[in-house]
Every structure is written in structure tokens, then in C-alpha cells.
Amino acid sequence: MVILNEKVLSSITAHAERDYPHECGGMLIGHFAADGGKTVAEIYPLENAREEEARHNRVLILPKDVMRAERYARDKKLDVIGYYHSHPDSPAVPSQYDLDHALPVWSYVIASVVKGKVADVLSWKMENDRSRFNEENIQTEEFATNAHG
């Protein structure tokens, strides 16, 4: 299971809709739980470095950008716990390309964007043997702010 608060879900949705008709992507920053669950505290949006004509169906994240996200998480005493990206005019289901480039411990949140609006958001977790993805439950919770500043 992956826990997303409303602010995180809104941020993923906004990024996916803003970059439509191109794919967007970013890192999920948060905590791993002892039971294998994950809590996403925030996202770290990344630039799609893919050449212009391929951005509609592929996202390319450069290693230097991943390292920057990992450093950001570490500085906040958090972990990179997954990755999110959009599928313009396609279902929120992992592609073979997604399977070929995934890691077993992370959550993979995919936003389906149809005609510029997010239609569905699903999360996926890869089998340890890397053979396939299984859908992962998303639990949403209200964003709680600290009233004391």
C-alpha cells in the first residue's frame, strides 16, 4: 500500500495536466514502513529530457536529476520511495518499457491524462523477480497542516 495525501495527489495531477500532451515524471519522496507500505510526503518533479518528438509517449530522466532528488530527500531525512509519471491519452497501466526500467521496492504511480485532464491515477509495485507489476492500493488522506507554523 502507498499512502498519498491530497496535496501530493493534487501536485501529481497538476504536473501531468500541465505537461500534456507530453509525459511528465518525478520522484516520490517519503518513508518506507516496516510492513512494506510507503507514505509519500511530497513529490520531486523532474524534467522530461526526451527529445521533443518522443515526449508524448516516453519520459527520460537524467541520472544527475535522480541524484539531485536523492540528495534532496536525504537532506530532509526522507527516502525516494518511488516514481510517478503520466500516460497521455493512455490508461494508467505500466507499459513494457515501464517494466524494463523499474525497481522492485519502489511504488510506480501512473496518471492517465485524457484530452488534458487526469482521468485515473493508479499505483503499481513490481514483483521481486521483476516479471510483472501488481496494482498497489492507494490510500488517500487529508493534508494536515501544523497550526503552530
List where the protein language model places each region.
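Conserved beta-strand-loop surface patch within small alpha/beta domains used
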Residues: 1-80, 89-149
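Residue-level "edge-of-site" marker
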Residues: 86
